[in-house]
Amino acid sequence: MFEEATRVPWLIRLAGQTRQKMISNPVSHIDFVPTLLDLLGEPNHSQCAGKSLLPLINDATALPNNVFLEWAPNRTKVKKGSRLARRRMIKRAVEESTRTLVSPEGWKLCLRDKDVNELYNLNEDPFEMHNLYSDPQHSSLVSRFTTEIHRWQDLTNDKLKL
């Protein structure tokens, strides 16, 4: 799951807003509804796993939460002769599931049910070329983020074994 597939801009204009503001930290789509409810003065629904981004919008020093991403295979059949990607890459995307955490500090951990797990420092390696997952220097980071992904899976009743 690469940045190009997950980076989606969200534009919002608030009543009384006189200046533009850009938040470059990753945020999650599941936070949009709680943010809109917060702006309307309504309570967040108990079934919404997301949190309001209003503190982040109003305060430039507020740190965003970790962002969790899920990829579940699309088991549809890809037409033979497709040139979207090499056959091996298409087969991998169709058959594997991934759970990803992107931290506010710029780290990204991808855990998979099949294939290789990955860790990237997006600040130093924005194109995700150097997988640091097996680097002993980053083992505590991998452990901490793995625990957070498992906690997220528990919260969202995600039964995928990683």
Residue ranges and their predicted role:
Residues P9, F32, L53, L109-R112, ...:
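Generic structural signal for small/hydrophobic residues in well-ordered secondary structure
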Residues E3, L69-S134, L162:
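C-terminal, low-complexity/hydrophilic appendages and adjacent surface loops
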Residues H29, V33, V116-L119, M129, ...:
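Internal amphipathic alpha-helical segments of the cytochrome P450 catalytic fold
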Residues L132-L162:
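Long, internal low-complexity/basic segments
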Residues V33-L37, G41, L54, Y120, ...:
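Non-transmembrane alpha-helical segments in soluble domains
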Residues P55-D59, T76-G81, D154:
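Short, solvent-exposed polar/charged micro-motifs at secondary-structure junctions
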Residues M1-Q47, K51-L63, E70, V102:
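Substrate-binding rim/cap in mid-to-C-terminal beta-strand-loop elements of soluble/periplasmic
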